[in-house]
C-alpha cells in the first residue's frame, strides 16, 4: 500500500471515499470522485477514530499524525508549524491531528507517553516516531526522511 509510480489511493477528507489518483495528477488539486470535495486542503485534518482508520488503513499515502492535547502548551505552540508543514508536504504526505483527550483509544493503542508526539505511518504501520515540539522545517525534514 505505497504510492506507486502510476497512482495513489487517496481518502477523501470529507466523505471518506477512496480515490485512485494518477501520480502526475497528485499536485493538480484533485477532487473526490464521489462528493467533488478537494482531496487536499493544504492543512492538517482533525481526526476522530473512524477518519484515522480510513486515512491510515485505506490510503496509500504516508500519513503523519500529530498526537496532541488542548491543555499542552508545546502542542499549541507547534500547531502553526505543523499547519505550515502540511502546505509543504501535501500531496506526498497526508497530515492528521489527533486530540488524545477526545480520542483516548488512539493514544492508548500507540502508547503515547508524551505530547506532542508525531508518528509517520506507511502502509498502515508505524514507520517512525518523534516526540517534542519542532519548527516547520524540522517537521518537513523529519517527515521526508521517514517517508
Model-derived regions, located:
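Short linker/helix segments within small regulatory modules
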Residues: 21-30
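Short Cys/His-rich micro-motifs in 6-15 aa windows
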Residues: 36-44
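A short beta-strand-turn-helix
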Residues: 44-63
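Short pre-active-site segment immediately N-terminal to redox-active cysteine/selenocysteine motifs
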Residues: 60, 67-71, 114
Amino acid at each position: 500500500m505505497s504510492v506507486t509510480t502510476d497512482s495513489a489511493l487517496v481518502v477523501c477528507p470529507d466523505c471518506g471515499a477512496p480515490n485512485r489518483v494518477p501520480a502526475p495528477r497528485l499536485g493538480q488539486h484533485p477532487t473526490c470522485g464521489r462528493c467533488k470535495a478537494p482531496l487536499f486542503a493544504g492543512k492538517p485534518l482533525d481526526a476522530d477514530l473512524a477518519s484515522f482508520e480510513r486515512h491510515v488503513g485505506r490510503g496509500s499515502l504516508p500519513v503523519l499524525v500529530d498526537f496532541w492535547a488542548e491543555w499542552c502548551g508545546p502542542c499549541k505552540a507547534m500547531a502553526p508549524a505543523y499547519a505550515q508543514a502540511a502546505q509543504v508536504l501535501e500531496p506526498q504526505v497526508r497530515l492528521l491531528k489527533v486530540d488524545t483527550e477526545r480520542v483516548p483509544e488512539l493514544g492508548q493503542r500507540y502508547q503515547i507517553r508524551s505530547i506532542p508526539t508525531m508518528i509517520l505511518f506507511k502502509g498502515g504501520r508505524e514507520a517512525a516516531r518523534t516526540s517534542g515540539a519542532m519548527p516547520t522545517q524540522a517537521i518537513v525534514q523529519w517527515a521526508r526522511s521517514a517517508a
